[in-house]
Amino acid sequence: MKRILCALVLALLTGTALAQDAYPSRHITMVVPFPPGGVADLTGRPTAFAMEKFLKQRVIIENKTGAGGAIGMAYVANAKPDGYTIMMALSSISIIPEAEKLFERKSPYQMNQFAPIALISADPTVLVVRADSPWKSVKDLVEDAKKRPGKISFSSSGIYGTLHMAMEMFAQAADIKLWHVPYTGGGPAMNALVGGHVDALASGPSAVIGQIKGGKLRPLATWGDKRLAALPDVPTFKELGYDVEFYIWSGLFAPAGTPAPVMAALRNAAKQAVEDPEFKAIMTKIETPIHYLDAPEFQKFWDKDAAMLAAAVKRVGKVEDKK
C-alpha cells in the first residue's frame, strides 16, 4: 500500500513539474485596453508577433476597451495569474487609481495587482492639429484660446487617460481653458481630429507620424526634454517656455502572483522579441524607438513615473468633461 501511495505522490509531483516546465502549452492572450490604432495597439501587435517565435505558441491580441483603459486593466488585474493573460499597457495605468482618489471613488484596480515584465517603448507625446488649422504654432493656439476660453476642443483616449493628462498639463502651464472630448482610445481620438470633430490632440508619435507625413496633420510641439529625431523641426514645450514634460510609454504586465518560472519565460521572450530584426524593422517604420527595460529596471522606472503622474493628477485636480 505504501509503495502504491508513494508511486501516486511521485507521479503527481512529476506531472506537476512537467506541466510547469511545459509553459506555455497553449495560446497566450495579450490584452490591449484600448482600441486599434493607438500607441498600445501599435506596439502590442508587433511585440506579440515577435514573442510567438520564442514562446512557440500564439500570442493573441484582445482589445478590451472602455473607461480610458480601466476596463481592460481591471480585467487583467483580476485574471488568473498563470501566464496565459498578459497586457500591453500605457503610462495611464498609474493615473487611473490616483484620479479615482480625487473623486473618493474605489479604483477598479490597484497597481500592486500587476507584475511588470518589460518596458518596450517610451516617447514624448506630440501636440497635433489638422493641416488646414489656422494655428501654425503653439503661440497661435494659445492666443486664440485666451480669446475664446473653452471653445477649442481636444480629443483624448479617455478621462484622465494618458492623452488627456498631457493636454491638461499644457493648458495649466499656458493658463488657458480647453474643451475636453474623451473617446474610448487613441485611435478613435485621432479619427475625431482627422475627421474634423475636434481641433487638437496629444498623441504618441507612432500614432500620428503617418498622418503628419501624409499631410493631414500638423505638429506644433512635443512634451519631451529634447526634440524628436522623427520630427526635428518641431520644438519642445520647454523651448517655448512651458515647463511641461510628459512621456507615453508601453509596457508588458502580468497579473501579480504569476509564478516565477512563468515570469522568467515571459521576460526572456520579451527580451528576445525586442532584439528580433523583424520587430526592430516594424518599430522603425512606425517611428517608435525601442526603450527596453527588464522587469527589475522597469519596476524602478514605473515607480518613479507613477510618483510624477500622481503629483500631476493632484496639480490638475478634478476635471469635468464638457459633453
Which sequence ranges carry the predicted segments?
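Hinge/capping helix and adjacent helix->loop/strand transition within the periplasmic-binding protein
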Residues: 51, 78-84, 97-188, 237, ...
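Beta->alpha turn/N-cap motifs
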Residues: 88-93, 156, 185-186, 203-208, ...
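N-terminal (or domain-start) structured segment
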Residues: 20-113, 151, 159, 163, ...
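Sec-dependent N-terminal signal peptides
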Residues: 4-13
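N-terminal signal peptide c-region/cleavage motif recognized by signal peptidases
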Residues: 14-19
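C-terminal lobe and pocket-closing loops
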Residues: 110, 122, 208-275, 304-307, ...
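An extracytoplasmic/periplasmic, membrane-proximal ligand-sensing/linker region
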Residues: 25-27, 172-176, 260-323
